[in-house]
């Protein structure tokens, strides 16, 4: 098993409903360690930059508006097969299709406001981590 890092966002809908602690508990219970975290309110420019790969898709404007509608939590998670483990904890993108007990099944209302984001590959994780965190902000958890 490989120790990996992945990137995660707790989106404005889940932050507004005070689900941060419950979601962090899910990460830690699954063996993922939080090695960096911060709360921020994305600017339009930050959201457009982060989601640039979707800029030509019809939902881009609504996505940017949602992601700038309130504070978010961004975090870096570390653990065995972290990318896959995190995505399994999140559940399907559409909460109506997410397995019971997953973050999206338990905390999301719709496919548009689905509580959380997780990197889909190691390459995406590296890019997304670097978008929000400097190397100095990552704190390896060795104890």
UniProtKB/Swiss-Prot annotation:
Quaternary organization: Homotetramer.
Location in the cell reads:
Cytoplasm
Reaction(s) catalysed by this chain, per the record, are: a 2'-deoxyribonucleoside 5'-diphosphate + ATP = a 2'-deoxyribonucleoside 5'-triphosphate + ADP; a ribonucleoside 5'-diphosphate + ATP = a ribonucleoside 5'-triphosphate + ADP
Q: What does this protein do?
A: Major role in the synthesis of nucleoside triphosphates other than ATP. The ATP gamma phosphate is transferred to the NDP beta phosphate via a ping-pong mechanism, using a phosphorylated active-site intermediate.
* Cofactors (names): Mg(2+)
Keyword list, A-Z: ATP-binding, Cytoplasm, Kinase, Magnesium, Metal-binding, Nucleotide metabolism, Nucleotide-binding, Phosphoprotein, Transferase
- Residues annotated as the enzyme's active site: 117
The Gene Ontology biological process terms listed for this entry are: CTP biosynthetic process; GTP biosynthetic process; UTP biosynthetic process
- UniProt cross-references to Pfam families, sorted A to Z: NDK
Where is ATP bound in this sequence? 11, 59, 87, 93, 104, 114
A GO molecular function for this record? ATP binding
Family statement drawn from the similarity comment of this UniProt entry = Belongs to the NDK family.
Per UniProt, what is the name of the gene that codes for the protein in this document?
Answer: ndk
- What's one GO-annotated cellular component? cytoplasm
UniProt protein name: Nucleoside diphosphate kinase
- Is Ligase tagged as a keyword? no
Q: What is its EC number?
A: 2.7.4.6
